[in-house]
Amino acid sequence: MRTPLLSLENLSIYLNGFKGDAKKLVSNININIHRGEFVALIGESGSGKSLSALSTVGLLPSAIKASGKGKWLNLNYDLEDHNSLKMFRGKEIGFIFQEPLVSLNPLHTIGKQIGECITTHAHIPNADLKDKVIALLKDVKLDDPERRFNHYPHQLSGGQRQRVMIAMALSNKPKLLIADEPTTALDVTIQKEILDLLHSLRASYDLSILFITHNLKIVKNLADRLYIMKEGEIIETGKTEDVFKKPTHAYTKDLIEPKIKIIKSRLNTSKILLSAENLSVKYKGPRSLFRSSSKDFCALNKVFLNIKLGETLGVVGESGSGKTSLALAILKLIDYQGDIKLHLPEPRLRKKERLKNYRRNVQIVFQDPFSSLSPRLSIRDIIGEGIISHRIFSKEQVEEKILLALSRVDLEKDTLERYPHEFSGGQRQRIAIARAIIMEPKLLILDEPTSSLDAAIQKQIIKLLIDLQKDLNLSYLFISHDLELVSTISHRMVVMKDGMIVDEGTPARLLRYSKNEYTKRLVESSIF
């Protein structure tokens, strides 16, 4: 039997150390990774997958402790001994984090940061260091590496920053690369490029890879073996082909089944709810003492669209295509040129009150409910905050509406006195939806509402949204980079690129018959 490169035995992870009130986050799991293997660790948010990976190199937060044994080839080490873990970090085990903009230092160039990773473990003359860094940037296929060497993280796109993170992780030629959700925040075309890059680097660097994700689909053709995690336990493991053919656990079966087996709501009217004409958004370029003006950035360029009553309009496009600027403009949260009109009876109100009334009818659900929900407010206060601000309902009426909104998203009454950190990602998104629908809006803007959720929870949230649309006659502006998901829920779709709508039509037409080259590329990238 081959000796594993890395073994984790009886790994348990606790919140509040090992005290009496400690909460067990991960329970007695075992993981083996062999030389040259691509192993995927799959689970929803809060399952313990990222904590398990961080424990291998001693990067757990101070309030969280790990117990268990690790084995690197034939060397045993204690997961509680941080000094022994330091010798692996960076040199033997490289780590790629989910959000490179947070992980990279904004004050230093990428060349300097990669160079520091190298000199931490090796003595290299400065004359040779730059050449080594540029060679790494070439290996990760970063365009124009000589020029990028002197760039700062904010000057790079999300995909470029992730390539820099990969270069840093590879800088000391580790034997194992741990990639923690490295493609979650990326659009489909860049996601595919990063996955292809990892696949090629595995061969050229003779790497083992531990790939952590909530998306089982993306590792189907990459991983040799799978570990499926749920609520801190490994519930299924095996060769990828075997798990996909004959999953044994109900949760795994739910992850593997086609994304959504539900029927979108029928359109019963052609009446327009909202129209946007000649819509443009420009952001001012940087100013300085020595330069009074610079070129403004055009985020939206003369966009025309309309949304019907009860319709879901899907918006797809890569990062930087203008999707979020479109949402913010429709919410009237940023300055714009053009005309946005909500085709509803308007009461006679002052200008300030008209805007308040407009925003009551147009609500938004954000991508990350953990960031958009205040950690200091109870769920009762979060859901009721918006409707209380309008001061048109009594205390009893507000309470009644809070309970109704909660029941509509299938959450129990005892939820109200708890706080966001006590809930899973899917539950937090239900709370965010309840906060939006309590306002009784006509249009709900859904900005990547399921991108951070695993397939099983994603299906539940999409089914909930479709049920709410049928019950409340809601219109949706559904923004996502997931073409398959958008096509499932949408009645019509628009494709955005460089601030413009470059293609539009029914999902069937865009996915099968579009003649637009950009749309074709998005479709091809979304099929792994």
Predicted regions and their residues:
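ABC ATPase NBD Q-loop/coupling interface
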Residues: K69-M87, P125, D196, D339-N357, ...
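Conserved ABC ATPase "signature" region
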Residues: D128-R147, Q397-D414, E524
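Conserved ABC ATPase signature
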Residues: H151-L156, Q160, Y419-F423, Q427
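A short, proline-enriched helix->beta-strand linker immediately N-terminal to the Walker B motif
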Residues: S171-K175, I438-K442
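A short, surface-exposed alpha-helical micro-motif characterized by mixed small hydrophobic
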Residues: V219-N221, V486-T488
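ABC ATPase "signature
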Residues: I234-G238, K246, E504-G505, Y513
